Amino acid sequence: MKASEEEYRLNFFIKNDFKRKICKSCKTPFWTRDEKKEYCSDIPCTDYYFFDINIKSQPLTVKEAREKFLSFFEKRGHTRISPKPVLARWREDLYLTIASIVDFQPHVTSGLVPPPTNPLVVSQPSIRLEDIDNVGITFGRHLTTFEMAAHHAFNYPDHYVYWKEETTAYATEFFTKELGIPEEELNFKESWWEGGGNAGPCLEVTVGGLELATLVFMQYKITDNGNYTPLKLKIVDTGYGVERIAWITQKTPSAFHAIYGNLVYKFFNKIGVAYIDETLLKVASRFAGKIDPDNPDTIKIHRQMVSKELGIDIKAVEEELDRAAKVFQILDHTKTIMLMLADGLVPSNSGEGYLGRLVIRRALKVLRLLKSDVRLYELVKEQIDFWKEDFPQVLKNKDYILDAVELEQQRFEKILEKVPSIASTLARKSEITTEDLIQVYDSNGIPPDLLEEELKKKSVKFELPRNFYALVAKRHQTSTIKSAYDKVKLPKDMLEYITALQPTEKLYYKDQYMRSFEGKVLGVYKNYLILDKTTFYPEGGGQLGDTGLIIDEKSSKRYEVIDTQKVNDVIVHILKEEPSTIKVGDNVRGEINWERRYRLMRHHTVTHVILAAAKKVLGEHVWQAGAEKTPEKGRLDITHHKTLTEEEVKLIENYANSVISDRRQVKPLEMNRMEAEMKYGVSIYEGGVPNSATIRLLEIKDWDIESCGGTHVSNTSEIGAVKIINVERIQDGVIRLEYVAGPALVDYIRETQAKIVEASKIIGTSPDQLTSRLRRILNEIEEKNNLIIQYRRIIETELLNNLKPYEINGNKIYIIEGLGDEEENKEILRKLTSTDNTIAISISDNRLQIATSKNMRVDKIVEELLKGGGKGGGKGTFANVILNSKKSKEEIIEIVIKSL
């Protein structure tokens, strides 16, 4: 959609002598006080000429620019609010905070809840990875992390705050009066904005080739069919670039110098790259507006311009600018890494963790291309020291940040050992596509830049997309939200049936200890029953749905409830059989299986206790990645970058039991969503993000508070005690804890004791002697194993000395029949194939192990063997094959010869 001219023809512009002009280059309308101006003052229509503008403001650091902006709007009736984390954990569809408006999406922007204050001002650290491949090349125009300073106003039908006129006036006053930019240099470029399902006209504020702010007037909703419908809530959504404000006041040759100051020189030194020639940098920066990173020709033209201007050889210009760009990239990426990890990101292969790992690995790749020996954590440490006053959380979580970065570097270095093997596999393809490269990165974590050198050795050419990392990030930057209908275990026809039914009154919130109740039947469909009220808790938040009985008061017939589910606000009781005696309008009595429910309540409350204990022991980066509460046990999945030690598990358990024995009060609260976020932070959403204006919180006194809709005990003493019975790493960056509490703990102790008694009987000892007896048995087994190993070595030596190969056309083929286990065989086969042109095969019935020397291909042999039927495969120089039928040595040799 394109807005009409009238959308931008503001009284403010007319009264203040702004003229509407059309840019001679991009043909976009813009407003200016300079009647002679022909260009919109945005790149690439002009070069960066802000260096030549007389700006009255003293040079501002990022911190000073931020404070100047916030103070300006505070003095003009705006309330300053704290920024949110760079991880958008109040959103289920987005991993990173990409702009200040994300702080208020979707619940404020949809009108579900009011903003925390209105109007407001904030400086929100943001991360966008869509430009990650462009960082450094444009001298600071593109960054992955930046601060979006913003003032927001939310206009309701019955409450007007301010709109276009005032917003434009504020921008003009800030830039001309507060920063001292000459009035004739300020331009407002007409544009259109869309994002997050909303849209509206916007004005881009440009000065001297630099876009300093965007003023968005959010006033439309984009419907599913692409139409635009007016919003009742009209939102002023501005974004001022804090780093660009610092840049334009300092007039440094790059934005990196304005942002990082002396850290720029320190990074060049630590990385081991000579600092770029100052004159070259200044000239290159001035012409940088001409660079469109998506068009490689513009980069070439830019460097030719620099070469011509300075009379320097083009190759020297390219080499020096390439090196500098890489250092700038590392400056940018290490700050992004620091902020991500400080806010709790754990690098992994999925979700937000994937994006964090992507930035870390790109930084490591750049260091490798620069042939630098510096450890990445050393550079991140410099960032922490530099930003600790601006972002206190980076100092608080310093140990975790540095530990996680170093661990990621060690993992990356291990992965790089696979490069030759992966390159060999890719080299066999007739064409290497972008999709192939993305798949290799996703599966193995290997950047294509590092494959390039290996593939060149094999004379394989491929085109490396300039925006590779942006393409990968785009695939992983959002998450799919499941609707309420997708989340429940009910058939489609049942879901349609309940749409007309009124919400169910939730008695379990009024009294979590209520065991029975009376209710009126609102719906009966097959074996599904809906009442006007219930104390049956529906499955949710990892807690299983209640079971029990529904009793027909007319006939006294009892129906077993086998599960309880919820769709939106309607609760569905799932019966074991169709309730033939019950119809709509009847009164029934419900009785929950109290013993089962009470076990679930204990396991649910102790889950909150253990999560807070894990944070205390492991660090604030711990986040709930999943949970399940059953009558038998509880399960909690947490994000953490390492396997837990025995000592850490013991500490978590000890803290949890201490909280239980402290008899702490457990209290549910209901609060306005924004009020809860402002008071407790977004960590209240550990267990999920509810979609309501008022949210239910669970507070364990002086220990934990988070959003939770489950049922809980009222005091931690009711839990009794807890025992962590299993700890395992279920995926990269996620640890699973399993535990039992209350009666389930007693059951576990009984079962464990029974197993100890049974094990004692099997080995012929008493339970108290079990440990010492097992040690003796293990020692005996170890002695026998050592003896077996000695015998095997003797046999292996004899075999290697006496085994004669079949020699065909300069190739040697060794056949071994039925010797030892698979691992032993593999070792012998490797030794036999240590010289070129050698094949070794171990035969055991119809199972084959095949090895080849490095100059041969095992896959060709496998392919030929499987022509007669069977299955198998391998990679590199080793394979396993199972044939459909047993073959003789001679037949196998004949097949191998065919493959050569």
Swiss-Prot record:
Belongs to the class-II aminoacyl-tRNA synthetase family. It comes from the Archaea. This is Alanine--tRNA ligase. Consists of three domains; the N-terminal catalytic domain, the editing domain and the C-terminal C-Ala domain. The editing domain removes incorrectly charged amino acids, while the C-Ala domain, along with tRNA(Ala), serves as a bridge to cooperatively bring together the editing and aminoacylation centers thus stimulating deacylation of misacylated tRNAs. It is found in: Cytoplasm. Its cofactor is Zn(2+). Keywords: Aminoacyl-tRNA synthetase, ATP-binding, Cytoplasm, Ligase, Metal-binding, Nucleotide-binding, Protein biosynthesis, RNA-binding, tRNA-binding, Zinc. The gene is alaS.
